[in-house]
Amino acid sequence: MGESEKISVGIIGASGYGGVQLVRLLQEHPLVDIVYLGGKGSAGQTYAEIYPHLGHAVDLTIEPIDTEAIASRCQVVFLGLPNGLACDIAPPLIAKGCKVLDLSADYRFKNLETYSSWYNKDRSDLDTAKTAVYGLPELYREEIKSASLIGCPGCYPTASLMALSPLLKQGLILPETTIIDAKSGTSGGGRQAKTHLLLAEAEGSFGAYGVAKHRHTPEIEQISSDLAGHEVKVQFTPHLIPMVRGILSTVYATLRDPGLVREDLLTIYSAFYRSSPFVKILPNGLYPQTKWACGTNLCYLGIETDPRTDRVIVLSAIDNLIKGQAGQAVQCLNIMMGWEETLGLPQLCFYP
Amino acid sequence: MGESEKISVGIIGASGYGGVQLVRLLQEHPLVDIVYLGGKGSAGQTYAEIYPHLGHAVDLTIEPIDTEAIASRCQVVFLGLPNGLACDIAPPLIAKGCKVLDLSADYRFKNLETYSSWYNKDRSDLDTAKTAVYGLPELYREEIKSASLIGCPGCYPTASLMALSPLLKQGLILPETTIIDAKSGTSGGGRQAKTHLLLAEAEGSFGAYGVAKHRHTPEIEQISSDLAGHEVKVQFTPHLIPMVRGILSTVYATLRDPGLVREDLLTIYSAFYRSSPFVKILPNGLYPQTKWACGTNLCYLGIETDPRTDRVIVLSAIDNLIKGQAGQAVQCLNIMMGWEETLGLPQLCFYP
Amino acid sequence: MGESEKISVGIIGASGYGGVQLVRLLQEHPLVDIVYLGGKGSAGQTYAEIYPHLGHAVDLTIEPIDTEAIASRCQVVFLGLPNGLACDIAPPLIAKGCKVLDLSADYRFKNLETYSSWYNKDRSDLDTAKTAVYGLPELYREEIKSASLIGCPGCYPTASLMALSPLLKQGLILPETTIIDAKSGTSGGGRQAKTHLLLAEAEGSFGAYGVAKHRHTPEIEQISSDLAGHEVKVQFTPHLIPMVRGILSTVYATLRDPGLVREDLLTIYSAFYRSSPFVKILPNGLYPQTKWACGTNLCYLGIETDPRTDRVIVLSAIDNLIKGQAGQAVQCLNIMMGWEETLGLPQLCFYP
Amino acid sequence: MGESEKISVGIIGASGYGGVQLVRLLQEHPLVDIVYLGGKGSAGQTYAEIYPHLGHAVDLTIEPIDTEAIASRCQVVFLGLPNGLACDIAPPLIAKGCKVLDLSADYRFKNLETYSSWYNKDRSDLDTAKTAVYGLPELYREEIKSASLIGCPGCYPTASLMALSPLLKQGLILPETTIIDAKSGTSGGGRQAKTHLLLAEAEGSFGAYGVAKHRHTPEIEQISSDLAGHEVKVQFTPHLIPMVRGILSTVYATLRDPGLVREDLLTIYSAFYRSSPFVKILPNGLYPQTKWACGTNLCYLGIETDPRTDRVIVLSAIDNLIKGQAGQAVQCLNIMMGWEETLGLPQLCFYP
């Protein structure tokens, strides 16, 4: 495929962790040219000033967010802004013919009332929002193919739904028994300086936050309900791990049929994810380490049943900034453009 | 109290992490003299050779494990050996009049068949085992007072039972819904060199192990059943955190009475632990960080209810090597000797 | 000694890391009552709101910085404020009869022009500054005894001067060959949220900063010159270690007499620090780990000579927040009050 | 270039960290097929048993080390064995026509007596050793082109020599003033379980080792002497950083001409490394973070002069397992084969 077939891409919110992952991945993507880096506070800075390690590879300056200019230069736009901003920027971009992939929560919800009640923001872009597709390719690959607007999933929902989906879709569990105990590296908190994310505070410590009220709960429930065909409520508890990258979700649910054993579930999961190149189901008795997924777009799944309690326990590991964010967005881009789904997406971590 | 009233104490298995915590704590305990350090592989080494940072404080050499010699010199003996060794050493020591506090699993079980089936070791010390008291002072303070043999709890059971006990004792939850998602620093794996505990392997990673089959499960179930008054089964999943010290247990259960709210439970927990100086119940909406407990014998508890799911979620943080091991043993010693329960036990961490 | 003999102490700047160490140490000091916590941004907050883990131990509220009120209630005042503020607060406190221990750089310099040129602040408190004593007890114990104002040393200078002093004092090295390659945990950067101190940025990374221009250079040189009896210039390079606490200084210098061997220097160092209870000189061939000093007021020194190059290499490890800051201030207090130098100061770390 | 032009490669010592980096890099190298994984203790295991995260990518079993079989199947062989083994394996492989790249110390020394005295091993392969080229492409690119046997540099020497070479080659410093204060992540210690490399021991700590006697000293001196044209002695001190990957070398030396300023040296370094695609010289006042190099074959250099002391300070950051080991070996392979030097070698890290 020739140089001329590359598409022009803009990244808005390029100075954050989502942004720098997108820059990193798209810089090496064979069919993409990054032509616009946009930001608010960082406008005017060269990218090398913000991320000196990329000085040799990226020779761009952050520009102000000007939808007119963006649309005139970009075929595809990634939005990596804080929640509540994309819903103002995406509509004009779409109207001007851009494809938009939004990494915030703004376009993840079918029901904007759910969004508004959890994110404290009223919305007037209902028509645009209706066209958005939830960007989890393993579940919505077909819809993504023809979408113009992708609401990329949150990091916790990605890890959790990868673990839960086969169980819900096939009706194998009692949905109301679902408990998701999730743990994330601190990069999930973003690059803004917050005291509790300082190394001096977070290193050598582990704790929960947002117990019974984290905003990823309704997102997980929306997709879970879609898969189950009826409303599902889950218990979701996030924790911070003293490390940079990675999420592990430990998912518990009671099996509808206590006769199911691990081997059965391995078969079911393998079938469910047969066409999903980034899902790696671990053999009998192996559980994933988050580090195995670091720097890749992979999701590792480990599955266990407990005959003493009739429960299934699924362990799901991803890199929160790649499969949980920027990599998944690129995966969606590949699908939207009709390219190989794995194009430009790493599958081998650097271990250790 | 005069110098002459100090008791003479031996620590067997002094070269491991349990051992060095005991040495550290007892070295500063006002009523204890360490007179015997025993070990197998390390016999003949000075303590400063094993732990150079203590060279200025501890001038003792590890001696072979000779029960005759130990009993002749020690009134109290702490055993910090691998599982399956204490059951050979404790009986002669007790027969010779020593009080024994065992940090291994050997004397935690009322039912030795349970022990044998989970620890693959047959036992012939039934008479001795029958006299052992489970060394969790917050639950068995009275029994500990008059005990000669203490089976000190495991680190995970300590954290988990502190969270669960008020709920089970008062019949507030449906016991079979109990899920314990526990996380520990790697020092819980001991000081023996194992590949998966290398910094290069464990740092920057998080994963589960022993899913549905960890040996702390029957221990938690034994005490839970005792508290509930009937057999209780729990789901217990341990994980390794990339840090040295600390355990967080996240405990989930369905409330029998969905009308109970957080404030009710805070009241119930405060009453339950009223006479327990090491338990700190956090006010509304605060959840513990493991680091707060590091270097102390404290257990911090945070409590939440979820009206959406009728569940209670309790978060319990301890230092796995102190409240989860050596500190708790010293707490038991204090109670056995009729001393102030907090004697020689730190209550203020060095933060950050 | 009776309760009535306790002194009343205030801590200004109590919300920072220096402050919380002082609170932690003085809370357990047998002859001190903390009666005033002062702060600027944090005034009005309870201490438990800032540091929840101390909620059970410290029942005080941060008050505004009012020198009148402070002096009326406190015999001794610790100042833990950013550089450039103590020089406005100390003079009125001293005038009203308080003893003052300042943890900032304001009173470390004999020559205020040196201070002004490195800290960009003009000073008008020359008379007060002249009375200040540099609070490194191992070098200035006699002067500290009768001082009313202590300029507590910086963390890097403490570690570095402990390593260098015997060499300079005895004229054993060529001073101009001195190179100090120092490394610190990130808590040295304080509790204010700065991007480069986020766990996500600092974890898993190591780098230098302030090369050839760090403000601790003139401080080290002032004391080095005082010891050598002539002006000394040193090369000082600080680095950030991905961990919370601890400093290691690696100090290099060319020996004046190449015939000196390690054993000679061990003897010289032992004699030099004979009356210094917190200095621990490691035997032949042992080098300190920063973790050995964590949570203690100790300084571990390891010494090596290289006959191939005629250099001496000294390794010095401290806890930057204790011996490098708050603990050293308490050590000075003990000396000023005529108490045992080690009172209330921990000497045993929790290892691992 | 067609599939048929790929070369067949063997990796001996594939289970260690050097081995797994080679597997990782060569698996994605467009002109290489891995056809043989060899090992001693690990022979018979599948690679997925040793490194489960690679189960989906590498379908090979470790075979015994049989030079006959290796030579019959491989054109190029990488040796990643402990020191002292390659010197028995390389000669027969070379005799049978293989090109050999050895990651151990065995072929780094021109003078085998130096090797023998530092590595305690007598050698009988003098003829083979004479043909070996030191595999630091930035210095010996021409010699590597035609070599059959490469002695790949140690990790510390790589970082240190990248910093030192322009200074030595151009005679800009007084060589005897050179001090190299080097710091490494713990993966440099390999995958064998050693107590001091446990996370519980190494995390949260920093210390020196091998002071004045580390085996990388003669290696650095050999190349330094070669560059300077006369014998050079350096002071080299390694330290362990509590992190997995990365080396920072802080190099000090006195300038021959004190008039030289940073800008001069930036110009000189840029010229020296003009044809070296992996060397990135940072602009004025920027110093490298090791994390910038992680997962890449890059070496970042930061340069400072100190007019107060007439010294130059150079900071050099690499990934110890890539540019410091496996990546550099692949870089040599590319040069030996006449391929693009950067082929298959990552240049963009995943930050943070």
Curated annotation (Swiss-Prot), chains A, B, C, D:
The protein's location, in the record's own words, is: Cytoplasm
Q: Which GO terms describe its biological process?
A: L-arginine biosynthetic process
A Pfam family of this chain: Semialdhyde_dhC_1
The molecular function GO annotations come to:
N-acetyl-gamma-glutamyl-phosphate reductase activity; NAD binding; NADP+ binding
- Catalytic positions are 155
Q: Which family does it belong to?
A: Belongs to the NAGSA dehydrogenase family. Type 1 subfamily.
State the function annotated in the UniProt record. Answer: Catalyzes the NADPH-dependent reduction of N-acetyl-5-glutamyl phosphate to yield N-acetyl-L-glutamate 5-semialdehyde.
Protein name stated in the entry: N-acetyl-gamma-glutamyl-phosphate reductase
